[in-house]
């Protein structure tokens, strides 16, 4: 906000996309609203989605602005995927990374391309899942210390999610290439005219397979962002954008994301005049409470002290 000279009172809508909130309730958007000191007339809400989450956030923010309900929106997206993964699990620990992003969208009088194609196949809801900890299967004494090893010796616990890798790969190869073709056609573009294809960085092999099957220009579809920053889930596609050179020509950009749900989304957007803040390392605030201090804080809260 400081880099774009935005005041807290300027924000009209706050959307927060994540899957691993600070607390089961309240939503992180309300917490962020208070931390940022936004005005009380600024509605704030969470969206619980993973790898397709950034595109879903853009879609809803764009729809709210296009409808005239608000003239701008601050879209926050972030998850701690690596922190939530058992680091001894070689199947998962080497895949995920932590990241957060902030995107400010506002209405302009100038016509700009902003086309979306969204979808969901709920029959695959259990292909990527964190089965414990919700109201259907709350943690209890039997599950909190649960530890299971798969055939490869990877340890899985109730505190982490799981994925049916082969099923998710097949889903990706079925959905992503056709999704790219559909969004290009919906925007009225030609694939060779697109400046950047920001494809969800599930892993390098998957991105390369999607590029090949979709027959899009490989030089315009980065695959090395996964190698640099891992799979950032909700932030994966925007990491591709932020990793571009400051002077990159990104007038015609396509975001293509797919994952948990099973869900997917793509957007074709004109990013002329975009301010790209790049990528930086997160530095935690020095006054943040550690785990022991937080526990003590809530004990006092329960006691009414």
Task: Kindly give the residue locations of the regions a language model identified.
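Glycine-rich loop at the start of a catalytic domain that most often binds anionic cofactors/ligands
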Residues: 27-30
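Short, high-confidence coil segments that cap the C-terminus of an alpha-helix
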Residues: 11, 70-71, 194, 250
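Condensing-enzyme catalytic core mediating Claisen C-C bond formation in acyl metabolism
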Residues: 89-170, 174, 178, 270-305
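Phosphate/pyrophosphate-binding loops at sites that engage ATP/ADP/AMP, CoA/4′-phosphopantetheine
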Residues: 1-12, 178-193, 244-245
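Short beta-strand-loop/turn "lid" adjacent to the catalytic site in phosphate-handling enzymes
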Residues: 10-22
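Short beta-strand segments
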Residues: 17, 48, 73-79, 105, ...
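Flexible, glycine-rich active-site loops centered on histidine and acidic residues
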Residues: 66-100
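Claisen-condensing/thiolase-fold acyl-transfer catalytic domains that form or cleave C-C bonds
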Residues: 20-22, 34, 39-41, 47-66, ...
